[in-house]
Amino acid sequence: MIYQTHYKISKIVDGDSIIVENIFNHKEIEIRLYGIDAPEAKRCSKLIQDERETHIAGEFLIELGLKATEFLRTIAPVGTDCTLIQEKDNTIDVYGRSLAYMILPTGEEINKLMIENGYAKPYEKSYCERLPEYQELNLVARTQRKGLYFYSEIF
């Protein structure tokens, strides 16, 4: 694992992407929250793919994506300090974003909080070390109809 400290959140992009800024050199990088997938908050090619896979209308998926984004803003507001943890073999996704687990000053992991509260699901198209834990947390959130599962059994 690679640990990187001295970052703060500068923008919430959507329910699974955050822009962080290095507090020393002010360089910004986009982080894809590793191992999780939240619905898209705007129309894009991934939304079309999700529509096909879930058989749910894009407009409804966007509503869910906006709810996930808003939840992320509440647990990790702009200006919050954070630590990034990356797996050595998986640091960048196909879009050039850095893959990371993000840790809040409280020690809580943002990725885990998103799944625990039902605002994201495990990203199962590629393996991450925490996937088994995320799958268990997702099952509990889904069973208890937390977060987005209140509105839909799948997303």
Predicted regions and their residues:
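Small beta-barrel nucleic-acid-binding modules, primarily SNase/OB-fold domains
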Residues: 1-155
